[in-house]
Structures are given as C-alpha cells and as structure tokens.
C-alpha cells in the first residue's frame, strides 16, 4: 500500500467532568460554520447526556 502525502489535522480534546469540553465543541461549531468536523464521543453510563448536548449539524 502506497503512503499518502495528504495529512489531516487532528485535535484531541480531553478534560475532567464539568471542565467545559462540550461548551467548547458547541462554540467551535457555531463560530466556524464552513468547517467540517468529525466528533467521536466516548460516553460511560446509562444516559448519553453529552451526545444530546452537542448540537446536531449536518454537512452540506
């Protein structure tokens, strides 16, 4: 398999409960409407609260 010269920037956002991760993600989504984002949400627990708090936006 030939290696690609294309690179994709990746940012990993981590933090403690209540540190503002979801707030930051929602702010980025609002302030950069033309930017394409991919999110991986890793939730533990019975209720998927963070997924509900991250605003749903569809790519054009």
Curated annotation (Swiss-Prot):
A cellular component annotation (GO) from this entry: cytoplasm
InterPro entries attached to this UniProt entry: CobW/HypB/UreG_nucleotide-bd (IPR003495), P-loop_NTPase (IPR027417), Zinc-reg_GTPase_activator (IPR051316)
Database matches in SUPFAM superfamilies: P-loop containing nucleoside triphosphate hydrolases
Protein name: Uncharacterized protein in trpE 3'region
């Amino acid at each position: 398999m030939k290696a690609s010269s294309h690179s994709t920037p990746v940012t990993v956002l981590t933090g403690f409960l209540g540190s503002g991760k979801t707030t930051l993600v929602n702010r980025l989504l609002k302030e950069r409407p033309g930017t394409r984002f991919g999110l991986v949400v890793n939730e533990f627990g019975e209720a998927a609260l963070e997924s509900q708090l991250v605003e749903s936006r569809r790519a054009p």
